[in-house]
């Protein structure tokens, strides 16, 4: 037991002084994710790929002209219009792309992407500038709340029951689809944003006390 305690103390003595560096790594990680994903919002496939989030969201659906509209899918079933114009990743369908242009899909994606990149850079700036870093961390937290709200508003979050030649018991809540598994990870971004913001806030207060 003594050997184990000595090992724990050895590791703790190495890790403890590196707290600031680890928090900076959190900032770098947040920035990488946000700049990469935000930057991809200028790409057609990524813009098309967020149509289900935007169309179903009470916070973002106003950005689209047609996506949230209910239309007949040709079988008498009323569905949201965006569902008739999905482009699978890696597949280019001209009529769907034209619809997305008319819908404002790409313009909305550019705005969302620019916002995400900005928040990522603000969070990264906390390494050197605590005020902007605190803002970035809090915005990361807020953005994560909005993203996680998609789990309530977006039907594609859950595995659908598509039928088959045998029962499909694993569908609906709590069975996350690939889309849902992507979104739920924003809980980590939310926590990281708060950690980054709190560390910046402590530096701001420490500097003001020193004056």
From Swiss-Prot:
**Compartments (UniProt record):** Cell membrane
- InterPro entries xrefs: RclC-like
Q: Which UniProt keywords apply?
A: Cell membrane, Membrane, Transmembrane, Transmembrane helix
Indicate what this protein is called per its UniProt record. Uncharacterized 23.0 kDa protein in purT/mpa1 5'region
Q: Does the keyword Transmembrane apply?
A: yes
Listed GO biological process terms: response to hypochlorite
- Bilayer topology term: Multi-pass membrane protein
Entry's transmembrane regions: 22-42, 111-131, 133-153
- What's in the GO CC field? plasma membrane
Family per record: To E.coli YkgB.
């Amino acid at each position: 037991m003594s050997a184990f305690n000595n090992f724990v103390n050895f590791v703790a003595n190495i890790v403890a002084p590196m707290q600031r560096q680890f928090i900076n790594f959190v900032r770098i990680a947040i920035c990488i994710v946000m700049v990469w994903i935000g930057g991809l919002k200028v790409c057609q496939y990524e813009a098309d790929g967020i149509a289900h989030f935007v169309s179903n969201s009470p916070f973002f659906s106003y950005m689209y002209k047609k996506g949230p509209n209910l239309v007949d899918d040709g079988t008498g079933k009323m569905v949201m219009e965006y569902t008739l114009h999905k482009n699978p990743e890696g597949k280019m369908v001209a009529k769907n792309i034209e619809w997305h242009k008319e819908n404002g899909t790409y313009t909305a994606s550019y705005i969302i992407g620019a916002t995400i990149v900005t928040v990522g850079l603000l969070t990264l700036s906390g390494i050197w500038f605590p005020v902007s870093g605190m803002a970035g961390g809090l915005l990361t937290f807020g953005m994560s709340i909005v993203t996680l709200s998609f789990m309530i508003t977006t039907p594609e979050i859950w595995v659908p029951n598509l039928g088959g030649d045998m029962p499909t018991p694993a569908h609906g809540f709590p069975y996350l689809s690939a889309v849902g598994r992507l979104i739920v990870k924003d809980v980590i971004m939310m926590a990281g944003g708060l950690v980054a913001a709190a560390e910046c806030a402590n530096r701001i207060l420490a500097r003001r006390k020193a004056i």
